[in-house]
Amino acid sequence: ASIPRMFCETDSQTYELTSSAEERPIGSQVVLHPKNDWMHLFEYDTFKKILVGYGEVLPYPVYLHHQDEEELVNTPSPVWLDPKATRKELLDYGAKVFQSSALDVFRIRTESGRVEGVLYVLPFRTQFSVRNSHKVYLKRMLLSEDDCNLLPQWAFFIRCLVNADGLLSTASRESLVSNDLLKDARKEIGMAIKDYLRGLVQNNRAMFNKILDVHHFHIKAIASEDNELLRLFMDYLPFETNKGVRNFGSIRSADNVICYTRNLEDFRQVRRIAGAQGWLVVNAAYTFDETLLKKYARLNPELTLDEISPSRLLEQFGEVEAKK
């Protein structure tokens, strides 16, 4: 039989390899001795919390021994990686993990980076500058509660619970290495989100409307960069007009000429005059709105955009007065 070997660190932070006279079973055993400054991390409750946090979904059983008792602390087959799990089970699990409900949940899987898991649609509005909490695992061990740049920049209405088997971590194991593989994985995840929304428009309009009510700003961001989704989503997107908020479908059906203003001050000055003349004017001062109008008009030549300004209205009224 082979002689057991021991690889030990000394107080001088050097290492030595020695033989052990004690018989040991086949395998490896790692013994860690905390330094005095870190003894508090090895108190039972603290240690268990850390162990569960990082190792909860490791694919092998992990046992914690304490006072002659043995406790299984992980779930080698978590519900969010179970293809047979129901939507309700996934929503319930997400509510437990993130302490927040979700509007909906859907599965993703990528070829690049071998990312697998579920994405939750947040039930509240978020700003582009706000960082949401996530759970990103690398080879089934928790890596970060940040999205690690796995999500596209516009996907702030999404919370991810995913595991990546084919991506690399930074040396500090605090995030994922930014390389072409991560970029390709992010692109696939972006396509999965778009496919999900496309499917809702076609098959579950009620759910799409719920998401649109909360996250129309983010849906506009998606539509502004994807012509196919622009065609699909545009009629449902809300725009502010001098006659209240209307979806674009109702604006387009009113007239093939769409009048709009580029900034809020112009809109405030124009809205009453336009209302008196019976015109419908869109306030395109908000982020993405003018871009969406112009891109949609280019894709639909039968539509004409007409930019309205206070000075132009005054000129038109002057011409009318001169003709009298």
Tell me the role of every PLM-derived stretch.
Residues 1-324:
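Conserved GHKL (Bergerat-fold) ATPase module
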